A protein has these predicted regions:
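Hot-dog-fold acyl-thioester-processing enzymes
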Residues: 1-61, 108-110, 116-198
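HotDog/MaoC-like acyl-thioester-processing domains
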Residues: 5-9, 67-151, 208-210, 219-250
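Short structured motifs
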Residues: 62-68, 80, 199-204
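Acidic/His-leaning functional-site neighborhoods
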Residues: 155, 159-244, 249-250
């Protein structure tokens, strides 16, 4: 069990609506559960959504690395731990560790968060210095910072799909989990039945909105290792870059 003055812990029962046909928590719901814990913790630390909104600001995730040791299963109860690790000029790193009730480490993750104004421009974190000092700089789920994915997959012969209602968040942007869903859906069922996700890195580059369309370009760089670029139809700009690593099922 992770413990510290500024850590946050939540428990979650894995119901049938959270799992796939393999009876395992889906990557999208894994992502959403960690994000919800981060949102709730930020609120408890005094720098949550409502507090920032009164100044015309909001939190946005910019990067995330997730190591999946074992995906939580249907009817399992998991313990979700999260904590901020400090901040610099524009970025607050935050870690997550998910465990079974018996203390088995299932998932480790590290993230970068920024504060944006309503025009999508970064805000200096010094504006919120006092609540952001409530952190655990020496506590790490993953010690290295979230990955910067440097290479894009070129846009070629795109087939665009619309951003739909279920993709939108409280800021009327495509929510972070929607990008994970889009990537997971780019692999067919046969692939999912024969592989399990073991690592995901995601870089958010720009926001996507309700009136937009997107497409995914994907390249296998090594066996089971895929790089994906998500492009917006508007000006053909890359909005998200994702790396997934998969292991074959026994």
């Amino acid at each position: 069990m992770v413990s510290g003055k500024y850590t946050y812990t939540d428990k979650q029962y894995i119901g049938s609506y959270l799992v796939d046909s393999k009876r395992m928590l889906t990557p999208t719901f894994l992502f959403n559960l960690m994000q919800e814990a981060a949102v709730n913790h930020a609120d408890k630390l005094g720098a949550g959504w409502d507090y920032l909104r009164q100044f015309g600001h909001f939190w946005a995730m910019s990067r995330m690395d997730v190591e999946i040791l074992r995906m939580p299963r249907w009817q399992e109860t998991i313990v979700i731990n999260t904590w901020p690790k400090g901040h610099n000029f524009l970025i607050q790193p935050r870690d997550h560790q998910i465990e079974s009730e018996d203390g088995e480490i299932l998932v480790r993750a590290t993230t970068n968060w920024v504060i944006l104004d309503l025009e999508g421009k970064p805000v200096q974190l010094s504006e919120y210095e006092e609540p952001l000092t409530r952190c655990e700089p020496e506590l790490h789920a993953i010690k290295s910072p979230a990955s910067r994915l440097r290479n894009a997959v070129p846009l070629e012969n795109p087939i665009f799909k619309p951003v739909v209602y279920s993709n939108l968040d409280v800021n009327h942007h495509a929510n972070n989990g929607a990008y994970v869903t889009w990537i997971m859906d780019s692999f067919d069922d046969a692939f999912h039945q024969s592989h399990d996700l073991s690592f995901l890195a995601i870089n958010y580059l720009q926001q996507t909105h309700a009136d937009d369309q997107y497409t995914i370009m994907k390249k296998e760089t090594a066996e089971g290792d895929f790089l994906c670029s998500i492009y917006s139809q508007k000006n053909s700009v890359e909005v998200c870059r994702v790396r997934t690593v998969w292991k074959g099922r026994r």
